[in-house]
Amino acid sequence: MSITFNAIDHSYDSINTEGIDWISVTTLVSYFKKPFDAKKVAEKVSKNKKSKWYGILPDEIQNIWNAESTRATTLGTYYHNQRESDLCALASIEREGFTIPIFSPLPEKDGIKYASIQKLEPGVYPEHMVYLKSVGICGQSDLVEIVNGKVNIIDYKTNKEIKTESYTDWEGKSDKLSPPLDNLDDCNFNHYALQLSIYMYIILKHNPKLKPGKIFIHHISFEQEDVDKWGYPIAKLNYNNEPIVKEVIPIAVPYLVDEVISIMHYLHDNKHKVKKK
């Protein structure tokens, strides 16, 4: 069995006729986050005299936010593609004292990516697609390493910042993810930790002889030429008109296996709710 990924609409589908209604890991994690009502927030900040958005039409504010989101996504896509290209140009690489092969993802056909075999041997797997048929979830890990009997996962993030705590109100109450994850702050570090932990869980399900290794976020920042009138960065470009990487900061991420198991149980009984949302 295998699945495909359509990069245009970010959808997953089965190659065969099993008709599984797939849910992406990012969609699954987002289900437990506090919803962000962009329209409502834009209307609120446009009326706040202390806000930089004061006096600006809410629709214009949302357009500015969307443009910034597109800018950040474009940078992220550039870095992902560059890393994949660099790694796939090599036959092997040294990791933890071992020389291991690099397995390129299957070639795209008409914009469609195909999942490779889920049973993994020692090596490096850029842009590795994972799926778990029993619960109908799938996703794509930026980098998976199988070395010395362990699974290492690395994910590239180009966000402005990685927040390890959520918003706390004047009473000292912080925003939490919804049950059964209400022990975790609703912040992007925990969102990513859950995402990568689910990838780890799926890989180990297909490869029970392997053990969990290290999980890292590589937080990427780029050289800035300037900032725009709203304070958003303008990337500095090299002679090839490409953004210049300033720094790559590795951030260790815990394997949240207990939380992942809770998600699997929840999904088994509530998949229709997750899809509906």
Predicted features along the sequence, with ranges:
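A generic structural motif
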Residues: 131, 144-146, 218-220
